Amino acid sequence: LANRTCEGDFEVSPINVEGKDVVILGGGDTGADCLGTSLRQGARSITQLEIMPRPSNERPGGQPWPTYPMIYRVSSAHEEGGERVYAVTTEEFLKDDNGDLRALVISEVEFKDGKFEPVEGTRREIPAQFAFLAMGFVGPEHGSMISQFGVELDPRGNVARNGTYATNVDGVFVAGDAGRGQSLIVWAIAEGRSAASAVDAYLMGSTQLPAPIAPTARPLMV
């Protein structure tokens, strides 16, 4: 849709939140992008929801330098406006008499027995005519292509691969989010180059193509 709008297929984007109440489900970078765009379109109010608790302002003791710390950050979009609400979950979408979205029902949550549970007595409505889902990536779609190839999946639902990006099916390789899981485009680019090297070696018996990273490589974290 964004590409078609930029190419001039629409005089005005079909999605316009001017004068509307916007709720964004997800507290990450994608949610911040949604917030910034909504601000520029002139939304009446913008609320960004995050199920996790608000991070600390200080680096946690268990995340020493040079690991990337999980701390409270304010992006350029957040500096411009909007409200961030932490430790909440969306329980219900409410519609008006015309069937259009009018509000979300949210509750505070607490972590119990390995999962987030709503806190009794904390349900409330927040107005919303637009809701954007920015909740992250739960794995590749297990639809026709994956089922037709017959590739195996790992415990997280991603396509399983070995150290050369090869799946259990001869001649089928996987790179990027489909094999790694949710990540950044720089990882997908590096994996794509490495997978191309592996495919070249598979077809030609050897390769001179660079392979920047192994499929098991991970960011420096604890």
Where are these predicted regions, by residue range?
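A structured beta-alpha segment of the ubiquitous adenosine-cofactor-binding alpha/beta core
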Residues: 10-13, 76-83, 87-129
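Cofactor-binding loop segments of dinucleotide-utilizing enzymes, especially the Rossmann-like FAD-
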Residues: 27, 50-54, 95, 177
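A conserved FAD-binding loop/helix module that cradles the flavin
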Residues: 31-36, 41, 175-209
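FAD-site-proximal beta/loop scaffold in flavoenzymes
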Residues: 1-19, 112-182
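Rossmann-like dinucleotide-binding cores of NAD(P)H-dependent redox enzymes
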Residues: 9, 35-92, 207-222
